[in-house]
Amino acid sequence: MGRIKNKQFAVIGLGRFGGSICKELHRMGHEVLAVDINEEKVNAYASYATHAVIANATEENELLSLGIRNFEYVIVAIGANIQASTLTTLLLKELDIPNIWVKAQNYYHHKVLEKIGADRIIHPEKDMGVKIAQSLSDENVLNYIDLSDEYSIVELLATRKLDSKSIIDLNVRAKYGCTILAIKHHGDICLSPAPEDIIREQDCLVIMGHKKDIKRFENEGM
C-alpha cells in the first residue's frame, strides 16, 4: 500500500485554528509555510513549519515575496479580522491559487467568501460539532465530512465481520451504492483499492456515498 505523497501548504493566520492545522500538516510530513502578521505567533509555530514568516497577507507584494504561487493549497485562517480575511482571499484568487480554503467567522462572511470564489469555506466550531456528534452516536465512525446535505465521506473502522474479506467480496458499490476510496492499514494508505485487496479488522475504510446508503452499509454490511 502506497503512502500519500507530500504536498505544499501555506497557512495564513496562526491562531488556535490555523496553528493546529499547521502542526498537523507538518506532523504528516507535508511542506508547510506558516504566515502571520504577529511575530510572537510566528515564533511559536516556527518549529512546526518548513518556513515561518512574518508578513501582511493583505499586501500583494508580500504574498508574492513568499512565493505563494508555488503552493497548491492555501488555508486562510485569519481570526476575527473579517476584512483582512476577505482581502487576502481575493488576492489569492487573483494570483490563481488552485485551492483556497478559508475560515468563515459568520454567515455574512461566508456569503462574501462564496461571492469571491473561495474553494472551501470552513466553520470550525460547526464542522467539529458535527464530527463529534457523529462519533458519539456511532463508535465505528472515526471521521466524517459532509459533501452536501445528501452525500458524505466517512471513515469507518473495519469490524471482525470484514476481516480477511476482499473488496470484491464486499461488493459495496453494487449492494449499497457506496464507493471505498481508500483503506488505511497501520499508517499505510491504499488509494483506490483493487478488487483483490484484503481488509483486516481495525483497518480504516474511507467510504463515499449517500448518507442513507452509508448508514445501511454500517447496519447490514459491518
From Swiss-Prot:
Q: What residue stretches are annotated with the RCK N-terminal domain?
A: 6-122
What would be one Gene Ontology cellular-component term for the protein? plasma membrane
Nuclease as a keyword?
A: no
User: Some GO term, biological process aspect, for this entry: which one?
Assistant: potassium ion transport
Keywords of the record: Cell membrane, Ion transport, Membrane, NAD, Potassium, Potassium transport, Transport
Q: Which GO terms describe its molecular function?
A: identical protein binding; monoatomic cation transmembrane transporter activity
What does the UniProt entry say about where the protein is found? Cell membrane
Q: Which residues bind NAD(+)?
A: 16, 36-38, 56-57, 78-80, 103-105, 109, 125
Q: Which SUPFAM superfamilies match?
A: NAD(P)-binding Rossmann-fold domains (SSF51735), TrkA C-terminal domain-like (SSF116726)
Reply yes or no: does the keyword Lyase apply: no
Q: Which InterPro entries match?
A: NAD(P)-bd_dom_sf, RCK_C, RCK_C_sf, RCK_N, Trk_Ktr_HKT_K-transport
Loss of this gene results in the following: Impaired potassium uptake.
User: Where in this chain does the record put each RCK C-terminal domain?
Assistant: 139-222
Which Pfam families does the record associate with it? TrkA_C (PF02080), TrkA_N (PF02254)
Q: Which residues form a coiled coil?
A: none
Membrane protein topology class: Peripheral membrane protein
Q: Main role? A: Catalytic subunit of the KtrAB potassium uptake transporter. The 2 major potassium transporter complexes KtrAB and KtrCD confer resistance to both suddenly imposed and prolonged osmotic stress.
Complexes and interactors: Homodimer, tetramer (dimer of homodimer) and octamer (tetramer of homodimer). Part of the KtrAB complex formed by an octameric catalytic ring of KtrA and a membrane associated dimer of KtrB forming a potassium channel.
Q: Which family does it belong to?
A: Belongs to the KtrA potassium transport family.
Write down what this protein is called. Ktr system potassium uptake protein A
Source organism of the structure? Bacillus subtilis (strain 168)
